[in-house]
A protein has these predicted regions:
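C-terminal regulatory/oligomerization modules of transcriptional regulators
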Residues: 2-4, 12-25, 119-187
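Short alpha-helical segments that sit at the start of domains
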Residues: 22-40
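Short amphipathic alpha-helical elements of helix-turn-helix/winged-helix folds
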Residues: 40-47, 109
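Short helix-capping/hinge SLiMs at alpha-helix to coil transitions
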Residues: 45-50, 96-97
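A short alpha-helical element within helix-turn-helix/winged-helix DNA-binding domains
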Residues: 52-63
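Canonical helix-turn-helix DNA-binding module
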Residues: 63-83
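Beta-hairpin "wing" of winged helix-turn-helix
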Residues: 81-89, 93-95
Length: 187
């Protein structure tokens, strides 16, 4: 009967691996809010310095719902990425130079800074734990590698500034930048 146990274990391992892979990939997935806020910040980075844009204009420019975008803009204000100027002629602007605002700043403002991977220490249960072969006194190798990968991801986002993105956009798609500036000057 050992063969049946091994086959059963192998089947569970494959099922676990598929589920775990899906869970890991879904954790790394960012919300559409990140895309929206990066594009909005990039729009302001391409605008003339000191440009104020109302939430409705930003929402219209990007084809986004104003109410939801306004909520995200407030998160950017709270984190010091944007400034909100009240009044009829008020609006939103970048609070710092675009060279000082990173993609990681924006992601953290809208998604938070919590670790992406949360180790549930499943190695403390199941067949290996029951066998006594699992040394839970050592750090979890999965946790170590996932943390290293997350740190590399955060470092890569922290290395990308809005200014760098704006310069790349201007070089690669100058007509998009021109249209953006024309649209802003017309409002």
């Amino acid at each position: 009967m050992p063969g049946n146990g091994v086959r059963g274990l192998a089947g569970r391992s494959r099922a676990w691996a598929g589920t775990r892979t899906t869970a890991i990939l879904s954790v790394v997935k960012m919300s559409s809010t990140v895309e929206w806020t990066v594009h909005v910040c990039l729009t302001l980075a391409c605008a003339p310095p000191g440009t104020l844009m109302q939430a409705g204009a930003l929402a219209e420019f990007h084809g986004l719902p104003k109410a939801y975008l306004t909520k995200q803009l407030q998160a950017l204000v709270k984190s010091g990425i944007m400034r909100s100027t009240p009044g009829v002629r008020g609006g939103f602007s970048l609070a710092r130079p675009s060279s000082e605002i990173t993609l990681m700043d924006i992601v953290a403002a809208v998604e938070g800074r919590a670790d992406l991977f949360q180790c549930a220490e499943i190695r403390k249960s199941g067949v290996i734990a029951e066998s006594g072969l699992s040394n839970v006194n050592l750090p979890c190798i999965v946790q170590i590698e996932m943390t290293k990968a997350e740190m590399a991801w955060r470092k890569a986002l922290a290395a990308q500034t809005l200014d760098g993105l704006a310069r790349r956009l201007e070089k690669g798609a100058p007509r998009v930048v021109d249209l953006t500036r024309q649209w802003i000057s017309a409002i």
